[in-house]
Amino acid sequence: MYLGEKAGKFFPQKSPERERVLEWLFWQVGGLGPMAGQVSHFVNYAPNFPGDHSYSEERYKNEYDRLLGVMDRILNEREYLAGDYSIADMASFPWVTAYKRYEVNLDLFANVRRWFDAIKSRPAVRKGIDVGKAARNFGEGISKESLKTMFKQDAKSIAEMAKKKEKE
């Protein structure tokens, strides 16, 4: 929001367009982002831990699928989430890019597919995708120590790490 307001682009200043962008931006923040993050965890990282994670993976894949359905319905009425290309699309797009890793057939959501392809073809978006390629590993080759740091933390372990750092 800050950059949209500061640059004066991709974030309308007048209602009702502004409210529509905010509605979809917060939809992403409260729905699409968290659910896609959960799918990512159970698809990419949970297999590194013992136990059956199939229920969790299935649950979050279904919710991700449902959210793509919500997008598909609104994109049947307009080109972009809030009408014109906006920060709402910019915030949502990255969470849709992983659809293949989540084993989602994006072609089942024709309007999302059209939206996705339109955004992906934007030159600035292409540059951003290319810049981030080297940083994406989706859990491949992560050390056991890194996994422990990422997922086995609680208040006690964080306090112990802080004490250890103080001694260094």
Regions found by a protein language model. Name each.
Residues 6-10, 24, 77-78, 97-103:
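Alpha-helix C-capping/helix-to-loop hinge sites
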Residues 132-168:
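Acidic/histidine-enriched, glycine/proline-rich intrinsically disordered or flexible terminal extensions
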Residues 9, 73-84, 123-128:
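Surface-exposed helix-capping loop/turn segments at secondary-structure junctions
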Residues 71, 89, 119-125:
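Residue-level signal for nonpolar/aromatic packing positions in well-ordered secondary structure
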